[in-house]
Amino acid sequence: MVMTDPIADYLTRIRNANMAKHTSVEIPASSMKKSLSEILKNEGFIRDYQVEDDNKQGMIKIFLKYGPNNERVISGLKRISKPGLRNYVSAENLPKVLNGLGIAIISTSAGVITDKEAREKNVGGEVIAYVW
């Protein structure tokens, strides 16, 4: 099967595992997905992730995070820039997700970073996804 949007697949797998209250989820690896996983970990949306090398593409195992009463930490994931309709923003027009409660993940010339980091560095780029 040919996958037309691997980032949407990544977000959907995390969303589905989160809704089913799984402790972890395995996703085919890529450098973009590793960057997204690092951002989710640094922002506190996932517990951890590890890259498992299988001498091919590899897999990323993401360990989901839940609150003390088993409530979900990730309440929403949304793909913004799609292969058929790319969404680019300038540094002045960087989006805020839920008035700063969520994050926007931006692919910039400085790498894949959050909207907060993009504001600090004063760079724009492609809006990959919103997470809240």
From Swiss-Prot:
One of its GO terms (biological process) is translation. The keyword rRNA-binding applies. Pfam families: Ribosomal_S8 (PF00410). It comes from Lactobacillus johnsonii (strain CNCM I-12250 / La1 / NCC 533). Coiled coil: none annotated. InterPro entries: Ribosomal_uS8 (IPR000630), Ribosomal_uS8_CS (IPR047863), Ribosomal_uS8_sf (IPR035987). Gene3D superfamilies: 3.30.1370.30, 3.30.1490.10. It comes from the Bacteria. Belongs to the universal ribosomal protein uS8 family. This is Small ribosomal subunit protein uS8. GO terms for cellular component: ribonucleoprotein complex; ribosome. The lineage of its organism: Bacteria, Bacillati, Bacillota, Bacilli, Lactobacillales. Keywords: Ribonucleoprotein, Ribosomal protein, RNA-binding, rRNA-binding. The gene is rpsH. One of its GO terms (molecular function) is structural constituent of ribosome. One of the primary rRNA binding proteins, it binds directly to 16S rRNA central domain where it helps coordinate assembly of the platform of the 30S subunit. Part of the 30S ribosomal subunit. Contacts proteins S5 and S12.
